[in-house]
C-alpha cells in the first residue's frame, strides 16, 4: 500500500439514544450518536419500540393540514 494516502483509523465513541456507549474504530474521526443499537433494536430485543417522529409529523401537518380540510 502507498504510505500517507489513507485516512486515520482511530477509536471513537458511539452513544445510543438508549444510553448504551460503545467504543468503535472508524475513519470518521469524531464521536457519533446513534438512534438504535443492538441493545435496544427490536430485532435483537424481541420487543416493539416506537420511534419518535413527532417533529416530522408536526411539520407535515403544519404544511399540508389545511389542504385536507374543506
Swiss-Prot record:
Pfam family, one: Ribosomal_L31
KW Ion transport (keyword) present: no
Entry's cofactor comment: Binds 1 zinc ion per subunit.
PROSITE patterns documented for this protein: RIBOSOMAL_L31
Family stated for the protein in its record: Belongs to the bacterial ribosomal protein bL31 family. Type A subfamily.
Record's function text: Binds the 23S rRNA.
Protein name, entry field: Large ribosomal subunit protein bL31
Organism: Alteromonas mediterranea (strain DSM 17117 / CIP 110805 / LMG 28347 / Deep ecotype)
Amino acid at each position: 500500500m502507498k504510505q500517507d494516502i489513507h485516512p486515520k483509523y482511530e477509536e471513537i465513541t458511539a452513544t445510543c439514544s438508549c444510553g448504551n456507549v460503545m467504543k468503535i474504530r472508524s475513519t470518521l474521526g469524531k464521536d457519533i450518536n446513534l438512534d438504535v443499537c443492538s441493545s435496544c433494536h427490536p430485532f435483537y430485543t424481541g420487543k416493539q419500540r416506537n420511534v419518535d417522529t413527532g417533529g416530522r409529523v408536526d411539520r407535515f401537518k403544519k404544511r399540508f393540514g389545511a389542504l385536507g380540510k374543506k
